[in-house]
C-alpha cells in the first residue's frame, strides 16, 4: 500500500466519521495508524508546532504575573485547539496530526543505536531531541535512563492523550 493509498483511506474514514457512520474510537485508531504510516508533518504545518508558535506570540504580547492573565492565556490556547479541531472535523486526521509516536520511536531508536555502538558523543548530541536536560555529563547508563524516562513521559503526552481525547471527543478533543 502506497502513502497515497494510506492518506486516501484515512480521508475516507474521516469523511465517514463526519457523517456519523463510524465511532470516534475507530477514527482515533485510524489516526494512530496514519501516524505510524506517515510520521509527523514538517514543523511548518505540524499542529503542535503551529500551536506553540501561536501561544508564544500570545504570551509575548500579553504576559503578566497575574492569575487573570494566566486564565486568559489558558482560555486562548484551549480555544485555538478546540477551534482547529472543529474546523478540521476528522478524528482520523486530527489524531494522525496530533500524535507523535513514530517520531518519538525513531529518536529513541537512534539514541539506542548510538549507545549500543558505544558512541556516547553521538548519543549525547541526539538526546535533546527527546528531553531538555543537558546531556554533557551523562554516562551511558544515565543517557539510557533519560531516554526511557522521556519516552515514557512523551508517550503519554504525544500518543496516549491525543488518541484518548480523540476517541472521547473527536477532532476537537485530539487538538484541544
Give names to the regions the model predicted.
Residues 1-176:
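Short amphipathic, positively biased membrane-proximal segments
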Amino acid at each position: 500500500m502506497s502513502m497515497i493509498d494510506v492518506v486516501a483511506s484515512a480521508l475516507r474514514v474521516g469523511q465517514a466519521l463526519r457523517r456519523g457512520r463510524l465511532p470516534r474510537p475507530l477514527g482515533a485508531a485510524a489516526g494512530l495508524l496514519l501516524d505510524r504510516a506517515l510520521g509527523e508533518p514538517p514543523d511548518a504545518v505540524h499542529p503542535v508546532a503551529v500551536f506553540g508558535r501561536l501561544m508564544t506570540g500570545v504570551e509575548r504580547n500579553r504576559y503578566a504575573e497575574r492569575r487573570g492573565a494566566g486564565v486568559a492565556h489558558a482560555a486562548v490556547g484551549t480555544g485555538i485547539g478546540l477551534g482547529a479541531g472543529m474546523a478540521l472535523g476528522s478524528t482520523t486526521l486530527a489524531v494522525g496530526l496530533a500524535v507523535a509516536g513514530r517520531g518519538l520511536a525513531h529518536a529513541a531508536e537512534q539514541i539506542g543505536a548510538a549507545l549500543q555502538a558505544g558512541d556516547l558523543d553521538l548519543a549525547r548530541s541526539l538526546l535533546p531531541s527527546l528531553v531538555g536536560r543537558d546531556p554533557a555529563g551523562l554516562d551511558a547508563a544515565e543517557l539510557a535512563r533519560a531516554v526511557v524516562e522521556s519516552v515514557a513521559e512523551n508517550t503519554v503526552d504525544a500518543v496516549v492523550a491525543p488518541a484518548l481525547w480523540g476517541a472521547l471527543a473527536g477532532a476537537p478533543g485530539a487538538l484541544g
